[in-house]
Design a protein with these regions (language model features):
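Short hydrophobic "strand-cap" motifs at the C-terminus of beta-strands
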Residues: 12, 101, 128
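Alpha-helical elements of Rossmann-like donor-binding domains used by nucleotide-donor carbohydrate transfer enzymes
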Residues: 21, 25, 47, 65, ...
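Structural signature of beta-strand start/N-cap positions in the alpha/beta core
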Residues: 8, 33, 71-73, 97, ...
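Short beta->alpha connector loops
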Residues: 15-18, 80-82, 105, 131-133
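N-terminal Rossmann-like dinucleotide-binding module
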Residues: 1-53
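Beta-loop-alpha module in the N-terminal Rossmann-like domain of NAD(P)-dependent dehydrogenases
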Residues: 57-117
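Alpha-helical structural signal in soluble globular domains
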Residues: 25-29, 48-52, 90-94, 110-117, ...
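A contiguous active-site-proximal alpha/beta segment in oxidoreductase catalytic domains
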Residues: 105-144
Length: 144
């Protein structure tokens, strides 16, 4: 089997409750080149820069810098819920695949519009909704 280069993924936002955990997972995955983070809020960015979840992370100066990098193929959107759809829209408009945490945002129609744009551009949008720690799923895993 031929080896492939790691997938270059960036993170947009740090305000979601799971943001630093996802940054840690992306950084540790050998199949991912976690290439940086952009956070529009100076206060949130400075706080995140002091946390262990972002240790060693590159920080972009603007969304345009991150989204304009053609080597970045996907972006994990990790802002506040009310910000996520606008962030995701910027990402798909820039031709990036998107990973969104739950909930995707506040307005279903906006989410559906993003999905339509992504589909038209041949992009993937993945909504994270994991049950791996749910007791019922743990029992299923134990039986498998």
């Amino acid at each position: 089997m031929a080896s492939t280069d790691p997938v270059r993924i960036a993170q947009y936002g740090v305000s979601h409750a799971h943001a630093s955990g996802h940054a840690s997972v992306l950084s540790a995955d050998p199949e991912v080149d976690f290439c940086g983070v952009y956070e529009p809020s100076v206060d949130a960015r400075e706080s995140a820069q002091r946390s262990s979840g972002y240790e060693g992370a590159l920080w972009f100066d603007s969304a345009d810098e991150m989204l304009g990098d053609d080597s970045i193929v996907a972006v994990a959107v990790e802002g506040h819920v009310h910000e996520c759809l606008a962030m995701a829209r910027e990402c798909v408009d820039a031709g990036k695949h998107v990973w969104l945490d739950k909930p995707a945002g506040d307005v279903l129609e906006e989410f559906e519009e993003i999905l339509d744009i992504a589909r038209d551009k041949g992009l993937l949008v993945q909504l994270g909704y994991m049950f791996r720690y749910n007791e019922a799923f743990q029992r299923i895993f134990a039986l498998a």
